[in-house]
């Protein structure tokens, strides 16, 4: 936690640095005694809180959260998300939240970007994306989210992507999703589609969706 403080010269001396560390630990729900522990002495949730404290140490406006809850139990995931939301309200933070759990992404995000093989294929406000997905890959992802109602769940139609993944280091000129896309046409093999605004604030990289 103190590393960022030292690197950026944010404390005049060791006493001030140690005080900042304790303040940061308490901000994320830990205690002063945790400052003297080794990493293996923390639980998974506590380690995530330490990571958040480290990020806060340099007084950021923008934080990249790369899979911050993927290895945690569901109850701990909720605690970490609640902490992130609380800090966002209190400090006016902006997050880039990277995750595979689409339900959690919907909960915490204002805008969502869907990526496939390193490229954005769809970008829209959270509610708009979930209510009106346009790219075939986005539709397949959303169809895989389980619904906690057995009557609805058993009758849902999931979109199963067939085909194989292309070689990511030799994609050629065609659309990256061609080999698995259910609406692929001959024109899709000729060029990679650009991200186009198809309605206000809603962007899609698919020549079939943009028509």
Model regions and ranges:
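Conserved ABC ATPase signature
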Residues: 38-42, 46
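Conserved ABC ATPase "signature" region
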Residues: 5-9, 15-33, 142-143
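Charged, flexible cofactor/metal-binding loops and thiol motifs
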Residues: 125-211
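A short, proline-enriched helix->beta-strand linker immediately N-terminal to the Walker B motif
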Residues: 57-61
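ABC-type ATPase nucleotide-binding domain
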Residues: 3-9, 115, 145, 178, ...
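Interfacial catalytic loop of ABC nucleotide-binding domains
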Residues: 19, 36-38, 156
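P-loop NTP-binding/switch modules centered on Walker-like glycine-rich loops
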Residues: 64, 68, 72, 76-153
């Amino acid at each position: 936690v103190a590393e960022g403080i030292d690197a950026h010269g944010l404390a005049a001396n060791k006493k001030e640095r140690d005080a900042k560390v304790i303040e940061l630990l308490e901000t994320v729900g830990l205690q002063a005694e945790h400052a003297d522990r080794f990493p293996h002495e923390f639980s998974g949730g506590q380690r995530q809180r330490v990571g958040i404290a480290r990020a806060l140490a340099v007084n950021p406006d923008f934080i990249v959260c790369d899979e911050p809850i993927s290895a945690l139990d569901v109850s701990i995931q909720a605690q970490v998300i609640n902490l992130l939301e609380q800090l966002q309200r209190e400090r006016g933070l902006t997050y880039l939240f990277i995750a595979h759990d689409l339900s959690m992404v919907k909960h915490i995000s204002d805008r969502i970007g869907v990526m496939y093989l390193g490229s954005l294929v769809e970008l829209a406000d959270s509610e708009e994306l979930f209510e009106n997905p346009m790219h075939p890959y986005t539709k397949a992802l959303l169809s895989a989210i389980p619904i906690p109602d057995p009557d609805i769940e058993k009758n849902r139609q999931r979109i199963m992507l067939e085909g194989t993944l292309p070689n990511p280091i030799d994609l050629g000129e065609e659309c990256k999703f061609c080999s698995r896309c259910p609406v692929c046409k001959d024109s899709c093999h000729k060029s990679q589609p650009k991200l186009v605004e198809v309605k206000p604030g809603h962007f899609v990289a698919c020549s079939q969706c943009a028509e």
